[in-house]
């Protein structure tokens, strides 16, 4: 059994749950196909009746950085889901979010408009992004059981992130953001126990 001093970082960042029956599968936005493909596989295996990809594009960039045939992350992810066999009626729409915090907020708004009660949800995200995704979505869905079913992207996994300088920078950058981006959210909870949609991070 490993006992490296940074194993606690691995356990903190790289969440990985076994999929269970859920009400919806969340797919935070991005310009890579892996998460949509994993979400489609989970859908086709019967784990949830809906998939909710979310995203417009990265706010600092101002446009979708993937295939120029698509205007938004949602369009891109939706197309992959369709190609993988997910029926159009099972794909929900959220195409306004520009970063992960907004993915969580806007996804909640979509489901509230549908009057959907979400007891259990699956989140398919990049493996190194798992903890921060969990924190954002848990803040917006406090009473929902969230299961993280990640995909390895950029070759960054729990068993190799510490072997390469670029991978180390990505993972430790996530650790830093899990602190820096939650100051205002957690402080807001002192007086406001509800969802903190209005907090700017």
Locate each region found by the language model.
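A conserved mid-domain beta-alpha-beta active-site/ligand-binding segment of alpha/beta enzyme cores
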Residues: 165-201
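A structural signal for short, hydrophobic/glycine-enriched beta-strand patches
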Residues: 1-163
């Amino acid at each position: 059994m490993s006992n490296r001093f940074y194993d606690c970082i691995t356990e903190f960042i790289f969440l990985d749950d076994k999929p269970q029956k859920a009400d919806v599968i969340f797919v935070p936005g991005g310009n890579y196909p892996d998460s949509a493909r994993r979400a489609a596989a989970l859908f086709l295996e019967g784990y949830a009746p809906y998939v909710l990809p979310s995203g417009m594009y990265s706010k600092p960039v101002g446009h979708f950085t993937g295939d120029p045939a698509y205007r938004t992350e949602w369009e891109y992810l939706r197309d992959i889901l369709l190609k993988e066999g997910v029926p159009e009626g099972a794909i929900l729409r959220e195409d306004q979010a520009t970063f992960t915090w907004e993915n969580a907020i806007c996804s909640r708004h979509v489901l509230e408009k549908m009057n959907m009660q979400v007891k259990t949800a699956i989140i398919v995200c990049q493996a190194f992004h798992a903890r921060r995704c969990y924190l954002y979505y848990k803040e917006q869905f406090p009473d929902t059981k969230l299961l993280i079913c990640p995909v390895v992207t950029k070759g960054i996994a729990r068993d190799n992130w510490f072997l390469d300088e670029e991978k180390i920078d990505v993972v430790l950058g996530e650790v830093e953001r899990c602190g820096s981006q939650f100051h205002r959210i957690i402080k807001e909870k002192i007086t406001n126990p509800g969802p903190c949609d209005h907090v700017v991070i």
